[in-house]
């Protein structure tokens, strides 16, 4: 196979980009707005006028990239630190921690979109499991006013080690789903008083109907997450921004909009059918909701006289795809389950199929390590395989459009057996294996996609990408990608996490005094670049531990340098049956940007002609 170039430390990038930034007499403010799960090509002046205005009047990052695995916490960690996942250790939304996390429900595979779980993981990894400083933490320590408002999990991640719980301690203002309850991040009396004066409750309202995913017989929600996010916008515009202006010093505000992600996941527009999938009315209402939030923030900046001194960076964490639950090869799809339509893949299909192929007992880490009986699937899809569930040979962390496999004993023979089993399944499209396990035909090493770095959390042994194709009757493949997903959600609902271009093509734009106006950036950019660029805009002193770092997007700045980009393809050696993992990428200097990866014919965006398939309805 072709070995990739070694990624150089981006410290050189940071140093060489200083010419792009003028020395401002007054430091600028910065707002990072994240419309979770927003596909780049879905933004038009009609569907999302506020975001289209930022893109068209500011900088249009038309060649944008989410990091693989394309999940929220993974990409949140990249935006927060400027590092790739091999350094942050946030390999997906559900990871193997190597210990039992009590706040996560006594499991070794916690779902980490949870403040208490993040705090618990921090405690087990020297107080900061990311092992890299976040932009918001550095800004706070540099004297900026700082706040993070929005979706539970990634919002707190931006300053997860600060806490106002001790006298004299500094922290960012954090407002998320848990604010006001026992598991929420505490808020100061100053913020509480301001919220009360503004007529706002001290507890965040629930998602209500937007949180209802339905089941195999009941459609999910038809409501966007409007009331909850309206509350968060009110906190930002009526409390936080006026407070920051009154302090008369620069600020950084992170606003993480759960929509359109939540509406695209849970929508009830397409139960068990591929179309309209994530292009139905509920998903579009979610896009509008996020857009309305951005419009409200920009209006508040205007009203407060802050627009001229505020840079706004808008970037989605990932794209999105419609879920498929179809497979002709999976043994688990041939078993009947009470909660799964006939012949559809059940939640946890990867753990079930591997247990059968490897002839290993399967236990449920989300059910007190109980054995998974015949005809049942793991409650959350995760699985621990081996004779002793407390000392597993193999762990499956279920996530969605891709899954993580851990081998706690670093068993090379088991790794090869697992890969052989994966290659036999039609739902697999691309396999990445820990470099330390050696080269395995049909797979590429984790280092090729920047998943092998200085992370302190356990590294996955194998990352499995699932098959994707373009829904029938679609003219824009990235808008209607369909992917096999290991999830409780149903065929026709929404998911991400795969290496398809539908999931890697996230919306990105920027506007403000330190960005060009009306500029279309042809160069590849990524969510890791967001973190590093934010740090440079704020003139923060960063001391990275890992070397998997993004680059400052100098080409988007007045008088900034414009580097050159090239494209490339990396192919693994073929497996016995001829399958090979192929990675389509671009380069800017030593930086690599990953468009799509998988087996040819099974991943959207990998081939010249996007794979298409007629989908059955159930």
Question: How would you describe each model-predicted region?
Answer:
Residues 27-40, 53-55, 79, 139, ...:
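Beta-strand elements within well-structured catalytic alpha/beta cores of enzymes
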Residues 157-168, 220, 236-296, 326-328, ...:
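Active-site His/acidic residue clusters
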Residues 85-88, 147, 163-207, 274-292, ...:
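Acidic, His- and aromatic-enriched active-site or binding-groove loops in soluble protein domains
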Residues 429-462, 522, 539-574:
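Polar, surface-exposed loop/tail segments
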Residues 40, 52-53, 137-140, 400-433, ...:
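Non-catalytic, well-ordered alpha-helical segments in soluble enzyme domains
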């Amino acid at each position: 196979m072709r070995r990739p170039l070694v990624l150089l430390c981006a410290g050189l990038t940071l140093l060489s980009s200083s010419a792009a930034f003028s020395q401002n007499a007054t430091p600028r403010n910065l707002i990072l707005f994240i419309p979770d799960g927003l596909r780049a090509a879905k933004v038009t002046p009609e569907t999302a006028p506020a975001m289209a205005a930022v893109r068209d009047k500011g900088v249009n990052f038309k060649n944008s990239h989410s990091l693989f695995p394309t999940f929220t916490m993974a990409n949140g960690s990249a935006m927060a630190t400027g590092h790739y996942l091999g350094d942050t250790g946030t390999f997906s939304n559900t990871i193997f921690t190597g210990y039992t996390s009590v706040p996560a429900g006594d499991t070794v595979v916690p779902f980490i979109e949870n403040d208490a779980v993040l705090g618990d993981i921090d405690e087990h990894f020297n107080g900061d499991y990311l092992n890299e400083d976040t932009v918001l933490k550095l800004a706070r320590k540099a004297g900026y006013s700082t706040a993070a408002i929005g979706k539970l999990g990634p919002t707190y991640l931006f300053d997860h080690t600060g806490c106002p719980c001790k006298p004299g301690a500094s922290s960012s203002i954090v407002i998320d789903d848990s604010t006001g309850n026992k598991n929420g991040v505490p808020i100061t009396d100053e913020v509480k008083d301001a919220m009360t004066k503004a007529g706002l409750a001290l507890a965040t309202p629930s998602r209500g109907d937007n949180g209802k995913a339905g089941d195999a017989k009941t459609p999910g929600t038809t409501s966007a997450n409007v009331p909850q996010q309206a509350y968060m916008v009110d906190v930002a515009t009526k409390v936080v921004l006026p407070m920051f202006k009154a302090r008369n010093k620069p600020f950084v505000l992170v606003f993480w909009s759960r929509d359109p992600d939540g509406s695209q996941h849970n929508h009830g527009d397409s139960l068990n059918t591929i179309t309209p999938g994530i292009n139905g009315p509920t998903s579009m209402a979610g896009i509008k909701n996020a857009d309305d939030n951005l419009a409200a923030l920009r209006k508040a900046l205007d009203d407060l006289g802050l627009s001229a001194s505020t840079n706004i960076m808008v970037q989605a964490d990932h794209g999105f795809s419609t879920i498929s639950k179809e497979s002709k090869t999976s043994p688990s799809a041939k078993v009947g389950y009470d909660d799964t339509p006939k012949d559809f893949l059940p939640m946890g299909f990867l753990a079930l199929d591997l247990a059968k192929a490897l002839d290993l007992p399967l236990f449920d880490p989300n059910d007190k390590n109980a054995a998974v009986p015949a005809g049942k699937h793991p409650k959350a899809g995760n699985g621990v395989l081996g004779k002793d569930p407390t000392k597993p040979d193999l762990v499956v962390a279920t996530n969605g459009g891709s899954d993580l496999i851990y081998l706690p004993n670093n068993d090379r023979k088991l790794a090869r057996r697992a890969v052989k089993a994966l290659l036999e399944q039609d739902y697999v499209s691309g396999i990445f294996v820990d470099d330390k396990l050696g080269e395995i035909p049909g797979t590429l090493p984790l280092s090729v996609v920047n998943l092998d770095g200085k992370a302190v959390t356990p590294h996955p042994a194998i990352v499995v990408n699932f098959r994707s194709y373009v829904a029938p009757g679609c003219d824009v493949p990235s808008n209607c990608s369909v992917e096999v997903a290991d999830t409780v959600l149903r065929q026709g609902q929404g998911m991400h996490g795969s290496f398809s271009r539908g999931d890697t093509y996230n919306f990105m734009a920027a506007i403000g005094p330190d960005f060009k106006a009306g500029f279309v950036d042809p160069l590849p950019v990524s969510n890791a670049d967001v973190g590093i660029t934010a740090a440079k805009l704020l003139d923060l002193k960063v001391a990275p531990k890992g070397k998997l770092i993004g680059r400052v997007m100098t080409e988007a700045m007045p008088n900034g340098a414009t580097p050159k980009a090239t494209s490339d393809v990396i192919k693994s050696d073929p497996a016995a049956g001829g399958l090979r993992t192929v990675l389509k990428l671009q380069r800017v200097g030593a930086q690599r940007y990953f468009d799509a990866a998988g087996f040819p014919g099974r991943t959207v965006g990998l081939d010249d002609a996007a794979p298409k398939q007629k989908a059955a309805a159930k």
